[in-house]
Amino acid sequence: METRDVIFIDTNVFVKESYFLENNSINKIKELAEDGYVSLLWPEIAFNEVKSHVVRDMLEAFEQVCCKNTRVLRNDEDFQDYCQKGKDVVEGKALKLLENFKSKTNAYIIPNSYCTDVDDVFRKYFDKKKPFGSGKKKDEFPDAFIIQALETYCKKWR
């Protein structure tokens, strides 16, 4: 019986690797998935986090190019037209890159319905257990539900 490793990639890895660059770790994982060596599990919360981040970061980069302080091209009509219409194009490109990655890796999106034990998440929050701790505790709520979705899915199907 053939086995393959099942992996999850946290949002911060996508951000650190600048998402879908040709020679980064994310692309290597995509190649491993395409070749059948790994399967990707992606909780819906994490997928939506990556979607939000990639769109935000690509739009921020676009806005830096089209910033009002860009003196070199600010009087060029074609450039100004591009800057006015380009946001939708950039957002579409970001979403296309994400969907391409999801499709090529044949990632399984774990539905939010696998996040069923809210009491457990709050217990961990008040007891300062992982993923919570001192500091930015409230920022870890998405991670707590991501972990719960992965644990619930694995207990059910593995």
Positions of the model-derived regions?
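Active-site-proximal, substrate-binding regions of enzyme catalytic domains
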Residues: 3-157
